Each structure stands twice: as structure tokens, then as C-alpha cells.
Amino acid sequence: MARIAGVDIPNDKRVVISLTYVYGIGLATSKKILAAAGISEDVRVKDLTSDQEDAIRREIDSIKVEGDLRREVNLNIKRLMEIGSYRGIRHRRGLPVRGQNTKNNARTRKGKATAIAGKKK
């Protein structure tokens, strides 16, 4: 397995797919990286030369990925919570942030439903 940006990417997959295993690199970014490095998308990771791997690493170094990106996202969320914006309050309460209804659904954000005691008829 090749190690790129601190992540072991699978050898048997195409490079364009394998790069998406790195946090912050999706399919579109992966294609841009390979185009800039001058590498075909159809090449398998195990067939890459060390020069090609180095070219990919150089391109990825110019992009914010993995730990740096996670840290930035978390800092942005903390900033929203500190300034007391609506989105920050929703994050703090563990509710959906992007305007979804919460009357019936939103179980992923709210957690498991708890029974209300003494509500028998």
C-alpha cells in the first residue's frame, strides 16, 4: 500500500479512486491532482513509479487535507458557537443546523428517542 498524506491507499484500485481515501480529497479534486501531476486516471496504484508518487505528494501538499482540514472545520464550528450565531446554537444543542424540521425526524442529530414517564391515558 502506498502512503500518501499519512493514509495508506489501496494498491489494487485505480489512482483516481484511491486518492479519495484521503480526508478532503473527493473525486473532482483527485482528477485535478492527477491532471496537474500528468498521470493517467486509469493507472493502478501498484503500477505507479516512485517519481509519480512524489508528483502526487507534491500536488497534495498544496491542498489542505487530513488533520489540518479537520482542525479547521472544528475551529469554524467552535467559532460559530462562541459568537452565538443561530448555526452555533444549533451545533451546541445537537440539533440539525441547516433548517431541517425536527418535529418527527432528526434522530441522527438528536440521538435515541427517550420515553416520557407518566404519559399513559
Curated annotation (Swiss-Prot):
Show the segment(s) annotated as Disordered. Answer: 93-121
Establish whether keyword Ribosomal protein is in the entry.
yes
* Sequence ranges of Basic residues compositional bias: 106-121
Q: Which UniProt keywords apply?
A: Ribonucleoprotein, Ribosomal protein, RNA-binding, rRNA-binding, tRNA-binding
Q: Which GO terms describe its molecular function?
A: rRNA binding; structural constituent of ribosome; tRNA binding
Q: Which InterPro entries does the entry link to?
A: Rbsml_uS13_C, Ribosomal_uS13, Ribosomal_uS13-like_H2TH, Ribosomal_uS13_bac-type, Ribosomal_uS13_CS
GO aspect biological process, one term: translation
Q: Which Gene3D superfamilies match?
A: 1.10.8.50, 30s ribosomal protein s13, domain 2
Its domain of life reads Bacteria
Could you name the Gene Ontology cellular component terms for this entry? cytosol; small ribosomal subunit
Q: Which family does it belong to?
A: Belongs to the universal ribosomal protein uS13 family.
PANTHER family of this UniProt entry? Answer: 30S RIBOSOMAL PROTEIN S13/40S RIBOSOMAL PROTEIN S18, SMALL RIBOSOMAL SUBUNIT PROTEIN US13M
According to its UniProt entry, the function of this protein is described as: Located at the top of the head of the 30S subunit, it contacts several helices of the 16S rRNA. In the 70S ribosome it contacts the 23S rRNA (bridge B1a) and protein L5 of the 50S subunit (bridge B1b), connecting the 2 subunits; these bridges are implicated in subunit movement. Contacts the tRNAs in the A and P-sites.
Alphabetical list of NCBIfam families matching this protein: uS13_bact
Assembly and interaction partners:
Part of the 30S ribosomal subunit. Forms a loose heterodimer with protein S19. Forms two bridges to the 50S subunit in the 70S ribosome.
Protein name, per record: Small ribosomal subunit protein uS13
Q: Which organism is it from?
A: Streptococcus uberis (strain ATCC BAA-854 / 0140J)
Chain's gene name = rpsM
